[in-house]
């Protein structure tokens, strides 16, 4: 429980040959998709828009000027934990909409502000996402925070498809969850 890193490795396979890309762990960032949903649920809990155990019916969200956004398949009725286990995009979209103070209606306008984005980013940073790990390496990448503010991108942020994070940040995030919310400084 110290945050000590014992080894770092990154390999890329191309044409049946391995190449060392260990530095990508600190210097490259990626959209991480559904990995983010544990932190997204935490955003909902901390802002009192997710009630533990409350069920909703999975489906699609249709926002004005935005194509329908759905889970990968119809997942039926879901509570917060089942939505996380089955990776429901819809559940995260509904949480994000509630976070803006709106109630979902088909084809609604969804005005969002930088403050709505920051509600997610501030909680994500508590897990080490989008912030420096403070590891003792020069030029650590902290990922890219998208600067365009739109309802579509806001919903994408909630499912890990907008901002980018480094593999080292994801390691920090997973370790924070595994340590019951205690975030250790990586060293």
Regions picked out by a protein language model, each given a short descriptive name:
Residues 35, 39:
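Active-site His/Glu-centered metal-binding helix of metallohydrolases
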Residues 1-28, 42-187:
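Beta-lactam-recognizing serine transpeptidase/beta-lactamase-like catalytic domain environment
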């Amino acid at each position: 429980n110290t945050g000590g890193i014992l080894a770092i490795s990154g390999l890329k396979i191309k044409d049946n040959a391995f190449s060392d890309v260990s530095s990508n762990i600190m210097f490259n960032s990626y959209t991480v998709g559904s990995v983010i949903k544990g932190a997204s649920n935490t955003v909902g809990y901390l802002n009192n828009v997710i009630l533990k155990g409350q069920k909703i019916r999975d489906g699609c969200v249709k926002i004005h000027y935005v194509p329908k956004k759905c889970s990968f398949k119809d997942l039926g009725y879901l509570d917060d934990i089942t939505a996380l286990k089955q990776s429901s995009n819809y559940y995260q979209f509904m949480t994000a909409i509630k976070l803006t103070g709106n109630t979902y209606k088909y084809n609604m306008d969804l005005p969002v502000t930088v403050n709505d984005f920051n509600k997610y980013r501030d909680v994500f940073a508590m897990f080490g996402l989008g912030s420096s790990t403070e590891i003792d390496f020069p030029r650590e990448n902290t990922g890219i925070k998208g600067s365009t503010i739109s309802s579509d991108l806001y919903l994408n942020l909630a499912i890990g498809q907008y901002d980018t994070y480094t593999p080292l940040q994801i390691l920090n995030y997973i370790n924070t969850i595994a340590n019951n919310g205690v975030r250790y400084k990586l060293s």
